[in-house]
């Protein structure tokens, strides 16, 4: 499957304005963005087709013709963005700040709606920071691909913003991060589809701990561990009777990343051993490993996926971008006893994608084109 995108991003910072009130500073920002895209095949692409992930499998009709072989495309501007950064008064020895950022990527049945991207408050000390609110998931992190596509490297690069409580501590060139996160817009899969009920009923947030090392020579390296614990069901219908059940699916994921920033070029890479990270736009999910014959209570096992990507950029005014990503389905730790599975792309054995892009950049403006061939091998 091939995808072509023309990015007409008038990254015109529509509000690069600063306003002041006693002990407060407000900096407004934003941009108008347009995405024109053409796909040679039907694909998995949320956000009304604007967030490309991977091509769908063949779907033959009565004559054996592939129903997913047709092209599609459109033009959207709903990822245009508005935001405000607020610097507040000192609270003791801490500097206070806040951010609110929105776009128009929320959807009802027929229209786009204003959507919160980030909304948080933060307290900064000399070596530490506490952040409370919604911002980028720590697996998105400080290392992500520099490409034009809205998906920003997904399904190889985690893409997610969640409500969270985050603590960071910096010692010289090392920054430590610990986060507790809850789901809102990006949701895990389960018996009732994508829903926040699985983590809500779990009463256990997602947890992440990680470390980054940044050198004066331009290198950034780091890694982290992520835990998710879901309750897929609280009741079971078994032999025409309803039973209360105590089910839980817990999974660990691991990631490592590196980035080098030179004067006119960058190199970045990330690799994950991912389990149950479908809510971060990665391929993943879980299946059923056992069923209690008395009440239908189930145990679960996560699918494990190895996913990696690399990214190069060169230039500033005229900029070249290259990206390559690969995901491999490693199966489950325990044998599945049911064909029922919950997640995204679990019928895919492996996916490989490349992305070649060029952009022309001026102050407050960017225009670019990219070509992205992607191949998915289905089981």
Model-derived segments and spans:
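Surface-exposed loop/turn segments flanking beta-strands in extracellular/periplasmic regions
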Residues: 47-61, 289-295
